[in-house]
């Protein structure tokens, strides 16, 4: 399969991409990091995949590939910095900006499957963690809800 992973250089994305590449899927990683050496420091497993026809880095300066699946894990890390109101705005906008970009790039050639990662933080404490669970009212829940509403 031809797969675009947004946020493929992040914590979960690195593990996912490693697995997809091992399964011989054609993996495209969209990242906002423009410096390839920085990406390789974060995701050392990618060093062996450069030059492989099954792997490609994509950023704003590349043409987005035709793909069968988009997996969107993108967004600023919640754990990186202190959570202030400004930081929460950055976290939300980083996720919505990527969604808007993907919608624009793929509006005329939608993939068969679009997987959007969210978080269990959308649910109230002790709620059932699926689409039937009650939503929380904290900042994490508001971010998740805004993404899912998009």
PLM region descriptions:
Residues 3-23:
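N-terminal Rossmann NAD(P)H-binding glycine-rich loop of SDR-like oxidoreductase domains
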Residues 6, 30, 70-74, 114-120:
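SDR active-site strand-loop-helix element
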Residues 15, 19, 105, 150:
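Rossmann-fold NAD(P)-dependent oxidoreductase module
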Residues 26-32:
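Conserved glycine-rich Rossmann-like NAD(P)H-binding loop of the short-chain dehydrogenase/reductase
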Residues 34-40:
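Short, charged/polar "capping" segments at the starts of alpha-helices
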Residues 44-99, 108:
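NAD(P)H-binding glycine-rich loop region in Rossmannoid oxidoreductase-like domains
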Residues 101-139:
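Conserved Rossmann-fold NAD(P)-dependent oxidoreductase catalytic core, especially the SDR/UDP-sugar
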Residues 137-150:
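Active-site Tyr-X1-5-Lys
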